[in-house]
């Protein structure tokens, strides 16, 4: 614990205080009108009697830092920014029940549109979060087909070969040629309009374009416009909920620790998000809109009238919020929101029950809140790879997934592969609560052997696996296998982890094989040397895109119609 003498140097000014552990990592961040008074309160045990979390934090804190600000408002904003960056263990934190993607329109001379998994410190306008990755990718595809905004990371200062999207008519190609900046920016503004929920203009544009092409008997183009229009309407029709005369609002339903957010823009429900957090509505608003920097709508509807602090309300109003109101229980949107909230609560309870059961039934040292699963994949000993997936509170944490190439292992040897991955992973990273190995007794024992080689034992981590033939849960050493009914929540959880490790490993293995296979295919074509091969791969990205390209498109890259025809013939098009 920190020595009380540290209080002598703390000023009686507004600011932010930061408790740090012995590694120098922030473990709790707070703000104060008077830093000295606030920090002093932590040294009076009466102030946190019964608060185990605060007591534990103070036990682990070995240092205290602080930042003086000009006023309370600055301290409020700085606290939120520091929590966003450091995610301290003992602050009340909002936890996603799954990964929610964003769409980013960058702030550049020629902005690009891109799909990102997590909000980063990047210049531009963020839209989201969205509940459906496929929805996000489909929306970007539609917007590019209409407005031709780039999505590549190419250096526009150096003109290069046009990308495949340019040839498809889905990009203006500023990396390839000079583009009118005014025209491009007009397209960007229209994209932003659609992402803000206003789809009427783009619908009207597509309808008119379809009719115009039909009038001049360009039926191929007319069909393209029709298909794009149908896709757009289907994307938004599936989630359409008319509400509040087309206004923008967020509907927040909650029964702590579960919070549900329905995002409605221009009368369309575009996203349903769920989170877990121990805290009040005020805590949620602070975390969701201020710490995470999600843009507030003009209206927030909630189930209860709770008092919100003036500093949070003032901040949200500066960002565009007009008011927070209580939602009417007789409205259709309430019924839908409440039903979704109850479903999420049930799902969370099922996961919580499975984790508690896992501790008891598998005789684990603690509840497996963090599970890491490992699987090996190869093709008859070639292209050996490993996957590592991470589950937190029973849910996949995809930013924690890792891939490993095992090029040194030339023969089919799962045991040596597992030993290699275990050592590479846990020499640098902390152990999970439960280590899951996709395999039987031999694979599990190999993992334990590798852990011993780097200084760990079964006192440090539990290790289990699942035998593929009959879904038996296997343990290290002489511990007998465990048979559970297929519908048992613990077995279902482990099978979920197993299937995810397998899916991730197989996907990586196929990707590796595909890349090497594609290069081999091009190597076999007469007239394709290293330079042309590099240009083709850079331009088209892969064999599938090359197959879809016309001879004319390939000719532009290889500078020879004869070689372009030979490529098409060699790849299967006679």
Curated annotation (Swiss-Prot):
Domain of life: Bacteria
Keywords: Cytoplasm, DNA damage, DNA excision, DNA repair, Excision nuclease, SOS response
Boundaries of every UVR domain copy: 200-235
GO biological process: nucleotide-excision repair; SOS response
Subcellular location, record wording: Cytoplasm
GO molecular-function term, one example from the UniProt record: excinuclease ABC activity
Any single Gene Ontology cellular-component annotation: cytoplasm
CDD domains: GIY-YIG_UvrC_Cho
Domain called GIY-YIG: residue spans: 12-92
PROSITE patterns per record: GIY_YIG (PS50164), UVR (PS50151), UVRC (PS50165)
Gene3D superfamilies for this protein: 5' to 3' exonuclease, C-terminal subdomain, GIY-YIG endonuclease, UVR domain, UvrC, RNAse H endonuclease domain
Assembly with partners or alone: Interacts with UvrB in an incision complex.
Function: The UvrABC repair system catalyzes the recognition and processing of DNA lesions. UvrC both incises the 5' and 3' sides of the lesion. The N-terminal half is responsible for the 3' incision and the C-terminal half is responsible for the 5' incision.
Family of the protein in this entry: Belongs to the UvrC family.
NCBIfam families linked: uvrC
Protein name, UniProt field: UvrABC system protein C
Species the sequence originates in: Petrotoga mobilis (strain DSM 10674 / SJ95)
């Amino acid at each position: 614990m920190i020595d009380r003498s540290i209080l002598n140097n703390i000023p009686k000014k507004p600011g932010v205080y930061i408790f740090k552990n012995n590694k120098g990592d922030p473990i709790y961040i707070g703000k104060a009108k008077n830093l000295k008074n606030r920090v002093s309160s932590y040294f009076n045990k009466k102030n946190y009697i019964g608060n185990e979390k605060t007591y534990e934090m103070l036990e682990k804190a070995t240092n205290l830092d602080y930042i003086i600000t000009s006023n309370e408002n600055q301290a409020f904003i700085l606290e939120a920014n520091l929590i966003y960056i450091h995610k301290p263990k003992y602050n009340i934190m909002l936890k996603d029940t799954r990964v929610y993607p964003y769409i980013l329109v960058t702030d550049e001379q020629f902005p690009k549109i891109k799909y990102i998994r997590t909000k980063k410190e990047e210049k531009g306008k963020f839209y989201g979060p969205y509940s459906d990755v496929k929805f996000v990718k489909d929306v970007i595809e539609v917007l590019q087909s209409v407005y031709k905004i780039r999505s590549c990371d190419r250096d526009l200062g150096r003109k290069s070969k046009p990308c495949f999207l340019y040839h498809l008519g889905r990009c203006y190609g500023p990396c390839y040629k000079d583009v009118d900046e005014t025209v491009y920016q007009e397209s960007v503004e229209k994209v932003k309009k659609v992402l803000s929920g206003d789809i009427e203009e783009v619908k009207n544009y597509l309808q008119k374009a379809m009719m115009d092409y039909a009038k001049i008997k360009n039926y191929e183009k007319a069909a393209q416009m029709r298909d794009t229009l149908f896709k757009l309407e289907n994307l938004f029709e599936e989630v359409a909920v008319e509400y509040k005369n087309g206004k923008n609002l967020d509907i927040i339903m909650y029964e702590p620790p579960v919070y549900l957010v329905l995002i409605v823009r221009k009368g369309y429900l575009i996203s349903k998000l769920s989170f877990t957090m121990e805290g009040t509505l005020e805590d949620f608003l602070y975390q969701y809109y201020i710490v995470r920097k999600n843009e507030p709508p003009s209206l927030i509807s909630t189930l209860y009238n709770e008092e919100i602090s003036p500093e949070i309300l003032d901040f949200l109003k500066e960002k565009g919020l007009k008011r927070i109101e209580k939602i009417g229980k007789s409205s259709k949107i309430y019924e839908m929101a409440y039903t979704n909230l109850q479903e999420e609560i049930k799902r969370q309870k099922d996961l919580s029950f499975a984790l508690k059961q896992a501790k008891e039934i598998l005789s684990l040292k603690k509840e497996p809140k963090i599970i890491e699963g490992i699987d090996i994949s190869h093709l008859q000993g070639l292209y050996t790879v490993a996957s590592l997936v991470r589950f937190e509170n029973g849910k996949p944490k995809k930013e924690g997934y890792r891939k490993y190439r095992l090029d040194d292992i030339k023969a089919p040897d799962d045991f040596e592969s597992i030993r290699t991955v275990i050592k590479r992973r846990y020499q640098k990273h902390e152990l999970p609560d439960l280590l899951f190995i996709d395999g039987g007794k031999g694979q599990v024992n190999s993992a334990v052997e590798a852990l011993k080689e780097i200084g760990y034992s079964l006192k440090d981590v539990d290790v289990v696996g699942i035998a593929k033939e009959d879904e038996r849960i296997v343990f290290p050493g002489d511990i007998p296998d465990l048979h559970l009914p297929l519908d048992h929540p613990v077995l279902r959880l482990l099978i979920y982890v197993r299937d995810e490790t397998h899916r991730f490993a197989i996907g990586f293995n196929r990707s590796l094989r595909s890349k090497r296979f594609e290069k081999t295919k091009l190597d076999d074509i007469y007239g394709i040397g290293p330079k042309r091969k590099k240009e083709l791969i850079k331009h088209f990205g892969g064999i599938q895109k090359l197959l879809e390209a016309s001879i004319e498109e390939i000719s532009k890259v290889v500078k020879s119609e004869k070689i372009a025809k030979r490529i098409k013939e060699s790849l299967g098009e006679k």
